[in-house]
Amino acid sequence: MASQGTKRSYEQMETDGERQNATEIRASVGKMVGGIGRFYIQMCTELKLSDYEGRLIQNSLTIERMVLSAFDERRNKYLEEHPSAGKDPKKTGGPIYKRVDGKWMRELILYDKEEIRRIWRQANNGDDATAGLTHIMIWHSNLNDTTYQRTRALVRTGMDPRMCSLMQGSTLPRRSGAAGAAVKGVGTMVMELIRMIKRGINDRNFWRGENGRKTRIAYERMCNILKGKFQTAAQRAMMDQVRESRNPGNAEIEDLIFLARSALILRGSVAHKSCLPACVYGPAVASGYDFEREGYSLVGIDPFKLLQNSHVYSLIRPNENPAHKSQLVWMACNSAAFEDLRLSSFIRGTKVVPRGRLSTRGIQIASNENMDTMESSTLELRSRYWAIRTRSGGNTNQQRASAGQISIQPTFSVQRNLPFDKTTIMAAFTGNAEGRTSDMRAEIIRMMENARPEEVSFQGRGVFELSDERAANPIVPSFDMSNEGSYFFGDNAEEYDN
């Protein structure tokens, strides 16, 4: 967990809050999603979208991207200083899909960033509402996590494709703040640090001068974020060592890769939040629902209730399976890309299948795809039960480092037993004595060797009926746990490459 003095709930991070009580947090998170909803309604009016077109997830993504681009200070500044052909630094836009004469048409729109900022601020009582922007970023990140497997990125930084369950949030922009840092997996943080160290190795001036000082501060901050995700003293001590290094180089890279491997068993704590597309919040606000007054939480029943009665549509390519498209978005909405498939299936009430068995590509439609053959269908985003999102890695007891599930980073706080084949993971540690030998390494390896998969993780925690808003009667599911239900393993999902 984060070091004692700095513990703030995820909702507080989400809303830049000082210490708030539960009611205030619910109100400020409600205010945040309400603002996104109001902004979306206004954009749909501007673009003259019909109700159906406004509920099309592809239109939602374009509008969300426009507002993120309008507020991306650093990129805007960069674009103004380095003008590139055919790109107006003051404008933003994207494809909007409309139904014309029984066919879907693509229309490219262009807006002044200033205008988008004005509409966003107006929807948020004049504030910049950065929390709302971060919320949208996390929704995009969760969608990417569900759609793409980051094998190539892992291999590029010297990590192993088997570490894909550590990669939550790997596509989040750097400006995503505390709320963004909370949802990043151990592997994501390790990768960011390795990239930084590699730049330092290749560029002599990276750590020098006024800029170098800022770089150093950023490096130490990232180290501290990663340290805060680890739950054992030895892993944290190793992070201190990486952070305090005078001149970070290959030894630190090896240490970080070692730590990432160790996190497959000694799981880090990573937050999970249900962030929904703007086209879900919009219609709810339009129907008169007052999020701020009612209060809202990203980790409780609220997103489930919202998805239960929302209608979201998606464009479907000729050979895609609409049910599979629905699964992709359901997983993204519930931040469940790295959860055990059996558990997701139980909560959803329909079978959730691995990525490689889905007949669907991502949600976005490329500009060169033919629109003539596009159909649209309803996304089925409802669930049978609801469950509380967790931020623990599912290790059962921190004192005697127990084993977390290996190819899983749990999303829901629900009891499951831990099938896992430790030998495959321990094999990753033999024969690589790279980097320093240290007491900490020995200690971590010892903990991993001794880590017993306890019988169950999240003991006694269950799912709840959707009518059980107070979470009074947990239903503890039972699974056939003979094999582990990983979404990505043994699989050939598309790669994410910007």
Curated annotation (Swiss-Prot):
Family membership: Belongs to the influenza viruses nucleoprotein family.
Motif (Bipartite nuclear localization signal): 198-216
Keyword Ribonucleoprotein: yes
Function: Encapsidates the negative strand viral RNA, protecting it from nucleases. The encapsidated genomic RNA is termed the ribonucleoprotein (RNP) and serves as template for transcription and replication. The RNP needs to be localized in the host nucleus to start an infectious cycle, but is too large to diffuse through the nuclear pore complex. NP comprises at least 2 nuclear localization signals that are responsible for the active RNP import into the nucleus through cellular importin alpha/beta pathway.
UniProt-reported outcome of changing residue 290 to N: In strain: A/Fort Monmouth/1/1947-MA
UniProt-annotated location(s): Virion; Host nucleus
Protein name: Nucleoprotein
Assembly mode: Homomultimerizes to form the nucleocapsid. May bind host exportin-1/XPO1. Binds to viral genomic RNA. Protein-RNA contacts are mediated by a combination of electrostatic interactions between positively charged residues and the phosphate backbone and planar interactions between aromatic side chains and bases.
Keywords from the UniProt entry: Capsid protein, Helical capsid protein, Host nucleus, Host-virus interaction, Ribonucleoprotein, RNA-binding, Viral nucleoprotein, Viral penetration into host nucleus, Virion, Virus entry into host cell
GO molecular function: RNA binding; structural molecule activity
Basic and acidic residues bias: start-end ranges: 8-21
Tagged with keyword Isomerase: no
Ranges for region Disordered: 1-21
GO cellular component, one term: ribonucleoprotein complex
Any GO BP: viral penetration into host nucleus
Unconventional nuclear localization signal, short sequence motif: residues: 1-18
Post-translational modification: Late in virus-infected cells, may be cleaved from a 56-kDa protein to a 53-kDa protein by a cellular caspase. This cleavage might be a marker for the onset of apoptosis in infected cells or have a specific function in virus host interaction.
Highest taxon in the source lineage: Viruses
Lineage: Viruses, Riboviria, Orthornavirae, Negarnaviricota, Polyploviricotina
Pfam families attached to this UniProt entry: Flu_NP
